[in-house]
A protein has these predicted regions:
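Structural detector for short beta-strands of small beta-barrel domains
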Residues: 2-32, 86-90
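Short, basic/aromatic beta-hairpin or loop at an interaction surface
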Residues: 29-44
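A generic structural signal for short beta-strands and their flanking turns/coil linkers
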Residues: 34-36, 59-63, 78-83
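Amphipathic alpha-helical interaction segments
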Residues: 41, 55-57, 75
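Generic short beta-strand segments
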Residues: 43-44, 63-70
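A short, exposed loop/beta-hairpin motif centered on an aromatic-Gly-Thr core
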Residues: 47-49
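Short nucleic-acid-contacting surface segments enriched for D/E, G, S/T with interspersed K/R
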Residues: 51-65
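OB-fold/S1-family single-stranded nucleic acid-binding modules
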Residues: 68-90
Length: 90
């Protein structure tokens, strides 16, 4: 059984996407971390994850993502975001 299938089976709320194209990738400082925001082709929701250092831009690349759906409140408005736990180039 693959790592992804094991993760999905163990964590019921976890979702996975294969070979999706990255339309936009933004990296910005947030405390001691780099906050990465990725927009994917065919999705209107931002996918976010943290890293300790900056990485090469993923814009135009195909990636595999494992993520949780969550909602954040910004200025009193609930916004849907995806919290990425695993991202890999496909």
């Amino acid at each position: 059984m693959s790592d992804v299938k094991k993760l999905l089976k163990k964590h019921g709320q976890l979702n996975h996407l294969d070979a999706v194209k990255v339309v936009s990738h933004v990296q910005r400082d947030k405390d001691d971390w780099i906050l990465n925001t990725v927009m994917l082709e065919g999705y209107d929701v931002p996918f976010q994850y943290n890293r300790k250092k900056q990485y090469k831009s993923l814009t135009g690349a195909q990636v595999n993502l494992t993520f949780y759906a969550e909602s954040k409140t910004v200025a009193g408005i609930a916004i849907e975001m995806m919290r990425v736990v695993r991202i890999r180039r496909s």
